[in-house]
Amino acid sequence: STLLKAMLGTVSPVSGSVRRMQGLAVGLVPQVETIDWNFPVTVAECVGMARARGVRMPWITKRERAEIGSVLDRLGMAELGRRHIRELSGGQQQRVFLARALFTNAQVIFLDEPTSGLDVRTRHDVLHLLDDLNADGLTIVLTTHDLNGIAAHLPTVVCLNRSVIGAGRPDEVLVPDVLERTYGSPMEVLEHGGMRVVVDAPLGDNVLPLRRSGGASA
């Protein structure tokens, strides 16, 4: 979260610097846990608020309403424009803030833990949506701790722990040495269905047998 804030210019880096291209339009999709979903706005109003900053009369114009409808339709939410944001599912909540970012004509979108708290199916839906947006030319930068559900499916992965530990394709970065230096504990990488799966490495005598009900050990 702090890294994204530094890249967006909302906090100053303690060291180093951030260079931003002049005229580059960026958008942020925050963690869903940081949003007050009881705030009294509809989906369309929430999206329209993205352009309200610095506007004396922040009312949605007829043209903007049409643009909002187009953005929501692109994300498969055309029928939800008048629904209150608290009535949305986790995946729909993520799409609302993606719509906000797209409504500002962002060229780069930053997402903070976009799959946090989502079930497996919804997580895959969000991932496929991001992949489609990226294929359409949108640059996407996201943070995640979900190595198996998200990181292994990304085209480029960067592991950070006070500095860059590794950067490259998932098969280059998701390796035991890089992961151990990133997380500070032993990790193992397995192959399953052509994909890399990261698991905690056993710690010798600290590993206890899993007991099933009835007293049998696994």
Residue ranges and their predicted role:
Residues T144-H145:
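H-loop/switch region of ABC-family ATPase nucleotide-binding domains
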Residues G48, K62-L80:
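Conserved ABC ATPase "signature" region
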Residues H84-L88, Q92:
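Conserved ABC ATPase signature
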Residues V175-P176, R181-A218:
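ABC ATPase nucleotide-binding domains
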Residues I109-D112:
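Catalytic Walker B motif of ABC-type/P-loop ATPase nucleotide-binding domains
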Residues L8:
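Helix-to-loop junction immediately C-terminal to a conserved catalytic motif
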Residues V120-T122:
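Helix N-cap at the start of a conserved alpha-helix in ABC-type nucleotide-binding domains
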